[in-house]
């Protein structure tokens, strides 16, 4: 019996993905003969199916990228599989990682299906559609490899990336697939696909669809990931990161939002946002009832009664926002110093009760928040704890209302503020960067590439090339957009502080876009989370730690037609050079 290639690709996808049910693949799959006879009329449906896979993929993509970083804090331990991302307690039986793997390979399978069935050169429109497929496939290989593979500077020719499966093998009934490609080979596949996309893409249909600029933006990031560390840079790849960044920055289709508009960035629908290059587009009709609880923003806030609101901005991130001056979120005296602080919304109580908030080290050796009621007596300020003990406060900054307190024999600095509602012991600093897109809800289209990132990519690449003046110009472009006169003075950036200053800006700018943990480890640095929260506050996760990579899902290994090697289960198996 002869099977058409579409069915074979579905079989291949189901075999590769393990837990996926063939019946769950889109019903609009059609035979290769139908497609080849009339490609123009069928391509839209096929492309829609490919893009649809990104919607389910983007949820675990965000969680495994963002939760492993230091921008957020969870209210307490959780039985949800995502808590493993926060706690670094890696296991191979994590359903969210399974979903990330499955959805990623579904997108790869559907993109490959279209590429293999339709010939190039029939028309500009068809070539553009093929370019979209190459973009999605290349992007997906990169995202999968950065989660399941080691940072590129660590022996990429030895460490394993992910399996490369770009079409239907000739012998589908006796299928044997190759083991995981190396990190180097996986990156090469992603680069080749994205360069092919760049060549074929000629029409910009907006940020919900792949475009030439989207391919160039992703190449900018990939080459940055390949550019080594600040201490040992790879100049060839750093220059390529600059080259591809130039192509995007010089494209008149895109521009940075001015400060006032950027403060509302999360509310602007992507098609009206000149900064967005590629997003995973979501629309309100995809959500009904309690669906908003389960969106990305639903863990960060409660909007309109929807959302779990169990994760908040970390003390570390709040301190970074306040570094150039206090951001005052109180309704009666609101003053945003750093535009990015507008994506944070503390849940003040309605009575506007004044407190002195600070972080202290408890008898358990961990950091905790305290909010003590204040009392004013002329120009003197004191506060009272829950046991009725009174403490005099010493003024540090009248403008910012910063004071110090001697508490349990140690001096701590804090601020006068209104009382913020607690979830367990943590003030609810809601994160709304992933909410309110076009409406007051949890609607959000996850951002894959935007222009702000590209300036920072180029800044880092310039720094690794030793061109610090050019790096500073790009760095200040982003700082001055968010902070009035926030740019560093000429000559400030140098070899000694380049990582610190550029990494800090990437954290501020790209927070809650699933970039943070990867940014830390790819440059050979450690992740520390020395701030209040239920996580291990004293742990240093080094870039050499085996937990930097996620485990391959066990279901995928069990169902794989061939050997699918698992990642190391302890540090002894990590290859660094």
Which residues are covered by each model-predicted region?
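Conserved, well-structured interaction surfaces
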Residues: 82-149, 177-186, 194-205, 440-446, ...
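Sec-dependent bacterial lipoprotein signal peptides
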Residues: 1-18
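Elongated scaffold/linker segments in the mid-to-C-terminal portions of large proteins
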Residues: 257-455, 462-464, 524-577
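"A position-specific structural signal for the A-helix of alpha-solenoid helical repeats
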Residues: 129, 136, 143, 218, ...
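Membrane-proximal, proline-rich intrinsically disordered regions
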Residues: 20-65, 486, 531-577
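Aromatic-residue-lined binding/catalytic grooves and analogous aromatic/hydrophobic interfacial grooves
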Residues: 201, 213-261, 276, 290-292, ...
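Short coil/turn linking the two alpha-helices of tandem helical-hairpin repeats
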Residues: 122, 145-152, 205, 222-234, ...
């Amino acid at each position: 019996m002869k099977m058409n290639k579409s069915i074979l690709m579905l079989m291949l996808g189901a075999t590769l993905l393990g837990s996926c049910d063939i019946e769950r693949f889109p019903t609009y799959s059609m035979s290769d003969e139908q497609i080849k006879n009339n490609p123009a009329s069928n391509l839209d449906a096929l492309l829609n199916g490919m893009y649809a896979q990104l919607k389910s993929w983007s949820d675990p993509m965000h969680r495994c990228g963002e939760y492993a970083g230091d921008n957020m804090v969870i209210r307490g331990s959780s039985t949800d599989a995502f808590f493993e991302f926060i706690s670094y307690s890696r296991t191979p039986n994590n359903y969210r990682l399974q979903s990330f793997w499955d959805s990623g390979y579904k997108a790869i399978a559907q993109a490959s299906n279209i590429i293999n069935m339709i010939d190039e050169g029939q028309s500009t429109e068809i070539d553009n559609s093929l370019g979209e497929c190459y973009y999605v496939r290349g992007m997906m290989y990169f995202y999968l490899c950065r989660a399941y593979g080691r940072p590129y500077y660590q022996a990429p020719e030895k460490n394993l990336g992910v399996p490369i499966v770009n079409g239907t093998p000739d012998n589908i009934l006796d299928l044997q697939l190759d083991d995981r490609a190396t990190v180097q080979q996986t990156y090469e596949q992603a680069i080749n696909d994205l360069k092919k996309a760049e060549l074929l893409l000629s029409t910009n249909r907006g940020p919900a669809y792949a475009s030439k600029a989207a391919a160039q933006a992703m190449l900018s990031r990939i080459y940055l990931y390949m550019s080594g560390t600040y201490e040992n840079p790879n100049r060839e790849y750093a220059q390529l990161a600059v080259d591809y960044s130039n192509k995007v920055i010089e494209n008149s289709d895109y521009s940075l939002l001015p400060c006032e508009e950027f403060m509302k960035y999360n509310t602007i629908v992507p098609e009206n946002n000149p900064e967005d290059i590629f997003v995973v587009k979501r629309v309100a009709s995809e959500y009904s009832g309690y669906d908003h609880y389960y969106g990305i923003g639903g863990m960060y806030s409660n909007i309109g009664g929807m959302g779990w609101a169990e994760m908040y901005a970390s003390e570390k991130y709040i301190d970074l926002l306040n570094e150039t001056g206090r951001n005052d979120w109180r309704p009666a005296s609101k003053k945003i110093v750093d535009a990015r602080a507008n994506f944070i919304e503390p849940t003040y109580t309605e009575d506007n009760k004044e407190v002195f908030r600070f972080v202290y080290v408890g008898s358990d050796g961990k950091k905790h928040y305290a909010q003590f009621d204040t009392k004013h007596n002329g120009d003197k300020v004191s506060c009272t704890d829950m046991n009725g003990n009174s403490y005099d406060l010493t003024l540090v900054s009248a403008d910012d209302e910063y004071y110090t307190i001697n508490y349990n024999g140690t001096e701590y600095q804090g601020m006068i503020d209104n009382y913020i509602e607690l979830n367990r012991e943590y003030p609810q600093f809601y994160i709304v960067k992933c909410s309110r897109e076009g409406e007051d809800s949890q609607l959000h289209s996850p951002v894959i590439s935007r222009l702000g990132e590209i300036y920072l990519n180029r800044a880092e690449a310039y720094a690794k090339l030793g061109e610090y003046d050019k790096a500073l110009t790009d760095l200040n472009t982003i700082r001055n957009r968010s902070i009035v006169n926030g740019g560093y003075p000429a000559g400030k950036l140098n070899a000694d502080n380049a990582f610190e200053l550029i990494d800090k800006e990437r954290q501020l700018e790209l927070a809650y876009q699933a970039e943070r943990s990867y940014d830390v480890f790819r440059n050979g640095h450690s992740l520390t989370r020395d701030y209040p929260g239920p996580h291990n506050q004293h742990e240093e996760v080094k870039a050499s730690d085996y937990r930097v990579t996620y485990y391959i899902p066990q279901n995928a290994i069990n169902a794989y037609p061939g050997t699918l090697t698992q990642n190391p289960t302890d540090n002894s198996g990590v290859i660094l050079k």
